């Protein structure tokens, strides 16, 4: 099955596959670029919307896209339930187009679906659509010879090399870079991931 088919199936029920608690990393992004009138956020690969809705609750104007119709449907439903508005729509990380500029852009658990031939263009696009002094947060799964592939790993996902992520946006100010190994239960089987994370700030002279 394709990635779209898999995620559509996971998201079709009333329960939220990833839960509704926002990622802890969002508080770090809020601290680095606090909300104020007119500040915009882009969530690339928003899933069922838990992070996008949280940022809307914080007061940002939020734009969020995902590959799945079910994910966007549940994002809109969660926003309505929480009493906030956002702009949620179906799009693809490999081909998305936006005419906005954003104060915060983040993508978690999605960049591994970038095709290799699209990586350079993707990061060029991020440079173009991030406002001066804006923040970008990205994490990627990293290949390690001593770790097995996760049981729910999709054939369309691409492992990154250790440190590869840090070579993109290299002229930006790094607020945080790290690599961690952690245990996960996705797919119902305990396993380990290695993940690289970058938080960087676009300098005002770009």
Where in this protein do the model-derived segments appear?
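Class I (Rossmann-like) S-adenosyl-L-methionine-dependent methyltransferase catalytic domain
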Residues: 1-35, 42, 48-100, 114-121, ...
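Short catalytic micro-motifs in class I SAM-dependent methyltransferases
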Residues: 109-110
């Amino acid at each position: 099955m394709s990635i779209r088919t898999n995620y559509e199936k996971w998201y079709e029920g009333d329960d939220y596959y990833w839960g509704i608690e926002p990622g802890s990393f969002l508080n770090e992004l809020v601290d680095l670029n606090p909300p104020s009138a007119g500040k915009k956020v882009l969530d690339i690969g928003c899933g069922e919307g838990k992070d996008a809705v949280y940022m809307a609750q914080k007061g940002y104007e939020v734009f969020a896209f995902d590959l799945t119709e079910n994910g966007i449907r549940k994002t809109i439903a969660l926003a309505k339930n929480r009493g906030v508005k956002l702009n949620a729509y179906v799009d693809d990380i490999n081909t998305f187009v936006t005419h906005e500029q954003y104060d915060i852009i983040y993508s978690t658990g999605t960049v591994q679906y970038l095709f290799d031939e699209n990586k350079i263009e993707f990061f060029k696009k991020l440079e173009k659509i991030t406002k001066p002094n804006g923040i970008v947060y990205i994490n990627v799964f990293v290949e390690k010879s001593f770790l097995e592939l996760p049981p729910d790993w999709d054939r369309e996902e691409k492992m990154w090399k250790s440190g590869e992520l840090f070579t993109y946006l290299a002229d930006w100010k790094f607020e945080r870079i790290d690599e961690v190994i952690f245990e996960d239960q996705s797919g119902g089987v305990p396993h380990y991931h290695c993940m690289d994370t970058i938080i960087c700030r676009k300098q005002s002279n770009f």
